[in-house]
Design a protein with these regions (language model features):
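Active-site loop-to-helix "anion-binding N-cap" substructures in soluble metabolic enzymes
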Residues: 1-400
C-alpha cells in the first residue's frame, strides 16, 4: 500500500504555521450556508493542529471566480459557518500571500485559526503556477491536505505546495485513502460495484476500469437502458443513449474476458409519464416495455436477486442511483438495495464504500449513511479514483 505522512508523523508544532488545504466550497442560499458537512469533515484536522499549538491557516476555493475577485465568492461568506462548527473564533484574511498574511501570522497565537481568501481569485491557482505556490509556501512551516474532493485537480494549493513544504495527509484525507484502498486497492473478494445514474457517456471510464477490478458489476439508472437496448431490448421512450450500443457491447466483452458478471434488471418499473406516483405506473418484465412507456426504476424481483448477490460479496463500491430516486415511487429499488448493503455492513460481512453527490443523497433518503463503512462526499475525485486515474493531490503526498 502507498505510504503517506499523516498528522501522527508531526513532531512539536507549537507556534509553527500550518497551511491546511480544506474544502470550504459550501452550498449557499440567500447568503447563508445550507450544508456544513465539508466543514465537519475538516474539523478533526483543524482542531488537532490548533490544540497542538500550531497557527492554522486554512486554504480553500469557493465557486468558480475564474481568477478574479468577486465579493459574493469571498470566503468571508463562510466564516460564521466555520466558527459554528469548530466552536472557535476564526479570523478572515483577504489575501493568500504577502505582507497582509505575514502581519496576520505575527498577530496569531499558537492555537489560533484563520481562513485565507478564496484561492481561485488568483489565476495562478488553477494554472498550478509555481511562483504562486512559492509565494504561499513562504508563510508556512508545513502543509496539510485534507481536501480529497479537490485532489483530482493539479492546482497550486492542492499539488504545488506539497512539493515545497513538508506535506501531510489530514485526518479526512487519511480516512478516505484508507477506505478507497480497502475497496479497490486490496479488497476482500468477491467485490461488487453498483454504478447508476443517467448516462453511460459520463461513466464510460468508470465502467471500463471496474470490469477489470470487480466480480459483479450492477448497472442501474438510465445507464441500464443503454445496455438493455444494446442487447436488443425495446426500452420504449426511456432515457437511452442508442448511439453507444457498440460501446456497451465492448464493455460486456471486456467483463466476460475479465470474469466479471454484469447484472442488468429483468423486471422494471415503467410509466407513460415522468411524474410523482403516476396512474400509468406498472411493473413489467424487461421484454414487455411498451413503445410509449419509460423505465424509471428497477423492479422488485431484480432487487431481490441483487440483494442475493450482495450477500455473497465481501466488498461493495457504490456510485449512483438505480432509478429516478428524486421522484416517488422511483426511489424504492435504490433505498431497498442500500438498506440491504447497510444491514450486511452492520453484520460485519461487507465492507461498503459509497461516493458521489446523488449517492450521498440516496443514502440519506434510505437513512443508511451512517451504516456504510465509508461515505465519500467527493464528486469528481471519487469518480476519477473509480476510473483508476492517478489523483495529483494524492500523488503529491506520497512518500517516495
Amino acid at each position: 500500500m502507498t505510504k503517506f505522512r499523516t498528522l501522527d508523523d508531526l513532531g512539536d508544532i507549537a507556534g509553527k504555521v500550518a497551511l491546511v488545504r480544506v474544502d470550504l466550497n459550501l452550498p449557499m442560499q440567500d447568503l447563508s450556508v445550507t450544508d456544513n458537512t465539508r466543514v465537519r469533515a475538516a474539523m478533526p484536522t483543524i482542531l488537532e493542529l490548533a490544540d497542538k499549538g500550531a497557527k492554522v491557516l486554512l486554504l480553500a476555493h469557493f465557486g468558480r471566480p475564474k481568477g478574479a475577485r468577486h465579493s459574493e465568492l469571498s470566503l468571508s461568506m463562510v466564516i460564521d459557518a466555520v466558527e459554528h462548527v469548530l466552536g472557535r473564533e476564526v479570523m478572515f484574511v483577504p489575501e493568500i500571500f504577502g505582507p497582509v498574511v505575514e502581519q496576520t501570522i505575527g498577530i496569531l497565537r499558537g492555537g489560533d485559526i484563520a481562513v485565507l481568501e478564496n484561492t481561485r481569485f488568483w489565476p495562478g491557482e488553477e494554472a498550478n503556477d509555481p511562483e504562486l505556490a512559492k509565494a504561499i509556501a513562504a508563510n508556512g512551516d508545513f502543509y496539510v491536505n485534507d481536501a480529497f474532493s479537490a485532489a483530482h485537480r493539479a492546482h497550486a494549493t492542492t499539488e504545488g505546495l506539497a512539493h515545497l513544504l513538508p506535506a501531510y495527509a489530514g485526518r479526512a484525507m487519511q480516512a478516505e485513502l484508507k477506505a478507497l484502498e480497502q475497496a479497490l486497492g486490496q479488497p476482500e473478494k468477491p467485490v461488487a460495484a453498483v454504478v447508476g445514474g443517467a448516462k453511460v457517456s459520463s461513466k464510460l471510464d468508470v465502467l471500463t476500469h471496474l470490469v477489470t477490478k470487480v466480480d459483479h458489476l450492477i448497472i442501474g439508472g438510465g445507464m441500464a437502458n443503454t445496455f438493455l437496448a444494446a442487447r436488443g431490448v425495446n426500452v420504449g421512450k426511456s432515457l437511452c443513449e442508442h448511439d453507444l450500443a457498440a460501446t456497451a457491447e465492448a464493455i460486456f466483452e471486456a467483463a466476460d474476458k475479465a470474469g466479471c458478471t454484469v447484472h442488468l434488471p429483468y423486471d422494471v418499473v415503467v410509466s407513460k409519464e415522468f411524474a410523482p406516483n403516476p396512474p400509468s405506473l406498472r411493473i413489467v418484465n424487461v421484454h414487455e416495455v411498451a413503445d410509449d412507456e419509460m423505465i424509471l426504476d428497477i423492479g422488485p424481483a431484480a432487487v431481490e436477486a441483487l440483494a442475493d448477490v450482495l450477500k455473497t460479496c465481501r466488498t461493495l463500491v457504490w456510485n449512483g442511483p438505480l432509478g429516478a430516486f428524486e421522484t416517488p415511487p422511483f426511489e424504492v429499488a435504490t433505498v431497498a438495495l442500500i438498506r440491504t448493503a447497510a444491514a450486511l455492513t452492520r453484520e460485519g460481512s461487507l465492507v461498503s464504500v459509497a461516493g458521489g453527490g446523488d449517492t450521498v443523497a440516496a443514502l440519506n433518503l434510505a437513512g443508511a449513511a451512517d451504516d456504510f463503512t465509508y461515505v465519500s462526499t467527493a464528486g469528481g475525485a471519487f469518480l476519477e479514483w473509480m476510473e483508476g486515474k492517478e489523483l495529483p493531490g494524492v500523488k503529491a503526498l506520497e512518500i517516495t
